[in-house]
A protein has these predicted regions:
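C-terminal binding/interaction regions
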Residues: 7-16, 86-160
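Acidic/glycine-enriched connector segments
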Residues: 21, 25, 32-33, 41-114, ...
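A generic secondary-structure signal marking the coil-to-beta-strand transition
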Residues: 1, 75-77, 152
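Short, amphipathic alpha-helical "lid/cap" segments that border enzyme active or binding sites
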Residues: 25-28, 159-164
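Generic N-terminal amphipathic, Lys/Arg-enriched alpha-helix
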Residues: 1-17, 28-34
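Short, hydrophobic alpha-helical segments
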Residues: 166-172
């Protein structure tokens, strides 16, 4: 299964990424030991942390990188898109079976909306801040972004449940 982890970009030693280090380490490690392929934007922040822990557990990590910039050193494979980060995010959604969201700013919000419109299962790892927690407050019936009910957005409060929810979801 190809699982995307989306969330905050930025320096791993600064707020808010630093506070999520343990969660990201656990998430990347457990995705890898379950033999799933980890896909992300391939650069810094949450992406670097989950990539590092997945690679340390001998997992496969694909970075779908914006523009022509270099991805982080923990990627098994780096795909330079030549696209801005918004378009890169949409391209990434076409290549995943499910996403797990950890915190995040506007780019994460874009990825959440794109995944929803494409019928990609979404798991919110709650308590991580940003759009991951913020979007939960606007969900219809606690699980849909709009009346079309394209895909159920699931809430998790720990890494094990987040992965299990992703594994048990089907892309529309």
């Amino acid at each position: 299964m190809k699982i995307a982890v989306i969330g905050y970009s930025g320096n791993v030693d600064e707020t808010p990424v630093k506070q999520l280090g343990e969660i990201c380490e656990e998430l990347g490690h457990k995705i890898a030991i379950k033999k799933h392929i980890l896909i992300n934007g391939g650069t810094d922040g949450i992406m670097a942390l989950v990539s590092r822990s997945a690679r340390n557990a001998s997992g496969e990590v694909i970075g779908i990188v914006a523009g022509l910039e270099s991805g982080n050193k923990h990627l098994s494979f780096e795909f330079k898109t030549g696209m801005d980060s918004s378009m890169r995010s949409v391209l990434m959604m076409y290549n995943v079976d499910a996403i797990i969201s950890v915190g995040g700013k506007a780019g994460t919000g874009l990825e959440l909306f794109s995944a929803y419109l494409m019928g990609i299962p979404i798991v919110l790892l709650r308590g991580t801040g940003g759009w991951t927690d913020r979007i939960a407050g606007v969900l219809i019936e606690g699980k849909y972004l709009d009346e079309r009910k394209l895909v159920e957005i699931k809430n998790s409060w720990n890494v094990d449940d987040a992965i299990e929810l992703a594994e048990n979801s089907k892309r529309r």
